[in-house]
């Protein structure tokens, strides 16, 4: 394969050129390094995920500050009197500043407004949002606390603040009012709903006003940008300049652009080739009795947006239509439970268990069952081995901003084998057009897509996978970080002209 356009080293060179004298401050709910107490000893973990993969090297190069909620049990023991600690632990390069929340604040801000209101509001999964006044008030106060800490960190110096996601929608306006000269950008990692859905939110004006405090606001795809700009126009009366993707609110422009997030292709590709993964493939094949069988895979956080019940039904229909695969195929559904104190997630877990019992009970035998369910947090080497073993991987999201599972599967298949079955309701479907695109609500079509993956000739599998790998390699996580940084810095310096693209 060809060399990728963007690498970690090129991103670091870009940082030096673009940032100049500005202090870079990243703000997110989730922290890049978590400190835990293990048998009285302080240990740290580096959470996996696209956000930390992209921004950690950027921060290591520019030496700024990352402000985040401190949720680790050892975090308070690791920081100094100003709640700061230098990271990474083995080669300190930038400052991590932690924000403390009470249990009540975490409940109202995170589990309440962020994930019981904004999350279902933003995803077309037909889960009714829960809008509680007390949750909204807590969300405001927590955003204000983040603003206070960021302003303290800026301390009157030139600064550029890069905010992450839906937990901090009010923060940009708070920062803009506190320091009009600061450069502010934000990336919204989930979909933005259409106008008719968004306007059910009782605090629609406040959310839009908060986000329009940004110089730059990024989404995964153009449709979400369009939805946001329509909401700003129709709800706030903001002026929208479609050609240049600018929204003018209070005569202040905000650039609204798509920046499709991705993965570290080269790192995943290298990990997939390791002897540890090869050994793990052998262990899993023996342990799960996968030898000679058609293996399918789903890797998801257990969330109602991921369409897990829909794929279980489709597997049942596949076996009904094609009984010759009974005893000859295994579908492995891996994923970790999340947000279990929210009713919708508890109901989802019960629904999944019921459907698994139905399908496995109907088609299973004494020594075989079609679906193996692993609702635990698996180590990376095991996940990588599962990707390598799977003839097909299913991403059946009902609505997803991007979905990196699809790109991780593609990046891991250096053998250029495997079939990706992908929902059209993901951002990834806009890029990975050689996947088998199937509507998860259409159970018969879904079942036939599984059959198509099962019988697809090796040459077609290779052609499709090679094309998708080229897309993911070129549009990797470092390209996302580079485009986001350049556009934020350029528009933040009041360069009111079309921003160049890479």
Where are these predicted regions, by residue range?
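Catalytic cores of carbohydrate-active enzymes across secretory and cytosolic contexts
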Residues: 1-502
């Amino acid at each position: 394969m060809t060399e990728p356009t963007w690498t970690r080293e090129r991103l670091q060179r870009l940082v030096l050129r673009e940032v100049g004298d500005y202090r870079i401050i990243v703000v997110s709910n989730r922290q890049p390094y978590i400190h835990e107490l293990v048998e009285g000893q302080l240990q740290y973990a580096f959470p996996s995920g696209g956000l930390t993969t992209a921004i950690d090297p950027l921060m290591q190069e520019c030496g700024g500050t990352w402000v985040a909620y401190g949720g680790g049990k050892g975090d308070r023991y690791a920081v100094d009197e100003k709640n700061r600690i230098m990271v990474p632990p083995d080669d300190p390069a930038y400052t991590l500043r932690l924000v403390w929340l009470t249990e009540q604040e975490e409940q109202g801000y995170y589990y309440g407004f962020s994930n019981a209101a904004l999350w279902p509001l933003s995803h077309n999964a037909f889960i009714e949002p829960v809008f509680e006044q007390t949750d909204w008030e807590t969300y405001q106060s927590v955003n204000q606390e983040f603003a206070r800490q960021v302003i303290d960190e800026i301390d009157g110096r030139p600064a550029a603040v890069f905010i992450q996601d839906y937990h901090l929608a009010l923060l940009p306006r708070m920062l803009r009012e506190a320091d009009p000269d600061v450069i502010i950008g934000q990336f919204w990692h989930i979909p933005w709903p259409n106008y008719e859905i968004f306007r059910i939110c009782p605090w629609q004006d406040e959310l839009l006003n908060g986000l329009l405090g940004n110089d730059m606001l990024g989404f995964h795809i153009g449709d979400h940008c369009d939805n946001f700009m329509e909401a700003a126009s129709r709800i706030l009366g903001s002026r929208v300049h479609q050609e240049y993707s600018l929204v003018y609110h209070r005569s202040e422009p905000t650039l609204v652009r798509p920046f499709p997030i991705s993965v570290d292709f080269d790192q995943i590709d290298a990990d997939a080739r390791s002897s540890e993964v090869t050994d793990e493939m052998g262990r899993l094949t023996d342990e799960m009795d996968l030898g000679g069988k058609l293996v399918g895979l789903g890797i998801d956080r257990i969330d109602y947006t991921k369409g897990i019940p829909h794929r279980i039904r489709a597997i049942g229909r596949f076996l009904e239509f094609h009984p010759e695969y009974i005893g000859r195929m295994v579908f492995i559904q891996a994923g970790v439970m999340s947000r279990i104190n929210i009713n919708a997630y508890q109901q989802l877990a019960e629904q999944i268990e019921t459907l698994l019992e139905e399908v496995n009970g109907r088609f299973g035998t004494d020594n075989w069952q079609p679906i193996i369910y692993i609702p635990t947090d698996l180590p990376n080497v095991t996940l990588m081995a599962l990707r390598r073993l799977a003839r097909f991987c299913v991403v059946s999201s009902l609505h997803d901003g991007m979905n990196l599972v699809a790109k991780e599967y593609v990046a891991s298949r250096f053998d250029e084998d495997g079939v990706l079955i992908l929902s059209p309701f993901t951002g990834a479907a806009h890029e990975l057009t050689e996947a088998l695109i199937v509507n998860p609500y259409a159970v018969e079509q879904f079942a036939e897509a599984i059959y198509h993956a099962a019988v697809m000739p090796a040459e077609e599998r290779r052609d499709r996978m090679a094309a998708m790998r080229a897309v993911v390699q070129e549009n990797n996580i470092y390209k996302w970080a580079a485009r986001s940084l350049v556009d934020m810095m350029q528009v933040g310096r009041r360069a009111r002209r079309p921003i160049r693209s890479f």
